[in-house]
Structures are given as C-alpha cells and as structure tokens.
Amino acid sequence: MSWQAYVDDHLMCDIDGNRLTAAAILGQDGSVWSQSATFPAFRLEEIAAILKDFDQPGTLAPTGLFLGGTKYMVIQGEAGAVIRGKKGSGGIIVKKTNQALIIGIYDEPLTPGQCNMIVERLGDYLIEQGL
C-alpha cells in the first residue's frame, strides 16, 4: 500500500459522515511521505519544535504548537507519543511512530475524540509494523 493510500483511506476516511480537515504522514526529518491536498505548507522549524516536545515534553506548552503558521494551544497529550492542540472549534493531533509523524487536523463537527481515534489507530498500526 502506498503512503498516499494510508492518508486517503485511513486518515481522510468518513466517520459518521465527517472527516479530518487535513492529514499527513511526515518523516521525522520533516520530509513529506504523503499528505492530503488540504494540508498546510509548513516550515521545518515547526516540525523541529514538535519533535523537541516529544523528546522534552512540555516545551510547546508556553508558546503553542505552530503548523503552517497556525497556532494551536497545546492540551493534554501522552508524553513522548501524542501531542494534542486546540484552536477554536478544531484542533490538531500529532502521533509519533518509530520513523514518522502522523498529523491530523480537524474542525467541527468532527470531535477531538474522533480525530484522536483516526490518527492514533494508524500510528499504532505503523508502530506494530516497525515504522
């Protein structure tokens, strides 16, 4: 299966008639493995800051998580595994695997719980596969 199929079929899937606003699978070097057409253009510094928070949990809390110039308030996540951010009625979930970052961006009516499920399910699968 191609990386694009993982994005199209597993991240941008329908959940009760709703779907993520944007999604991507990135290498931990910031390279794009695959992304939805709606995924924002980002700076490598933004990815570096996300990776730093995985290594040193809490570093993004004071400044917020930035992706594509959009600022998300960092909320409860799982240290070293998942970062969650909120902005208005939407937010972002970043799941770290052995080699990649799985990123999902959502807005209402999709709920934070639905976004968590979508992103973390794929991330857990990739971890099981050694990726």
From Swiss-Prot:
A Gene Ontology term for the protein's cellular component: cytoplasm
CDD domains, alphabetized: PROF
Listed GO MF terms: actin binding
InterPro entries per UniProt: PFN (IPR048278), PFN_euk (IPR005455), PFN_sf (IPR036140), Profilin_CS (IPR027310)
Short name of one Pfam family: Profilin
Keywords: Actin-binding, Allergen, Cytoplasm, Cytoskeleton
Superkingdom of this protein's organism: Eukaryota
Locations listed in the record: Cytoplasm, Cytoskeleton
Family listed: Belongs to the profilin family.
Subunit structure: Occurs in many kinds of cells as a complex with monomeric actin in a 1:1 ratio.
Functional summary from the UniProt entry: Binds to actin and affects the structure of the cytoskeleton. At high concentrations, profilin prevents the polymerization of actin, whereas it enhances it at low concentrations. By binding to PIP2, it inhibits the formation of IP3 and DG.
Name of the protein in its database record: Profilin
Protein source organism: Citrus sinensis
Organism ancestry: Eukaryota, Viridiplantae, Streptophyta, Embryophyta, Tracheophyta
